[in-house]
Amino acid sequence: GRGRWEIGIQGGVFSIFDFGAPSNDLVNADYLGGITFTYAFDSFSILTRIMHQSSHLGDEFLLNNEVERINLSFEELSVLLSYDPFEWLRAYGGTGVIVRSEPSNLERWSLEGGIELRPFTTSTKHRLQVLFGLDMRFWQQSNWQPDASFVAGVTLDPVGESSYRVDFLVRYYNGHSPNGQFFTERIQTLGPSVQLYF
């Protein structure tokens, strides 16, 4: 049969705060926005995305720390190919290229791949799935050193009622900081995550 086309819009604001400071200073905020084009056929799908990201340091953080501001922003074009051989397994991989950046000397290329396992699914009206996932990213700017993200948790997916989905996860990350101009620093984080999809 024929495949399916889908156009989507992505957006988000990701902020970090210094709760050790008297005024809970904003350290950094990343603003993301993009458009996605997806084509799905049988067990395969391909996603093409153009995304903009801009990062801004908090005013209090700049005043209280000797940090040189880098007005980091870029547009990236990426392509991901996904394969679902079974209902409980998905593997994906692809590449991205930065088409414009500030500063202009950022390396352009990146690779990404991962796997998702959903070994248990209820058949009730509100479908509940157990989820395990691994995502690996390699950026030329970081000399292709791996950034790894591991997740485990559950997904609530109301069957046949609406298109939303909620993920309740525990996430472990080991790699370069995803927070704006701190991308040269390696970090480790562990914490809960709640994600809502429409």
Model-flagged regions — what are they?
Residues 139-198:
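Predominantly the C-terminal beta-signal and adjacent terminal strand-loop region
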Residues 38-45, 79-80, 122-127, 161-168, ...:
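Short C-terminal domain-edge/linker segments immediately following a structured domain
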Residues 2-114, 174-176, 183-186:
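Outer-membrane pore/translocation modules
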Residues 35-39, 79-83, 113-119, 150-156, ...:
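Residues on the lipid-exposed face of transmembrane beta-strands in outer-membrane beta-barrel proteins
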Residues 6-8, 45-47, 90-94, 129-133, ...:
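Residue-level detector of the transmembrane beta-barrel scaffold of outer-membrane proteins
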Residues 16, 44, 55, 100, ...:
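Generic "edge-of-domain/loop-turn" microfeature
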Residues 1-7, 84-89, 119-130, 158-166:
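Short loop/turn motifs that connect adjacent beta-strands in outer-membrane beta-barrel proteins
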Residues 89, 93-97, 101-136, 144, ...:
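Elongated scaffolding segments in large macromolecular assemblies
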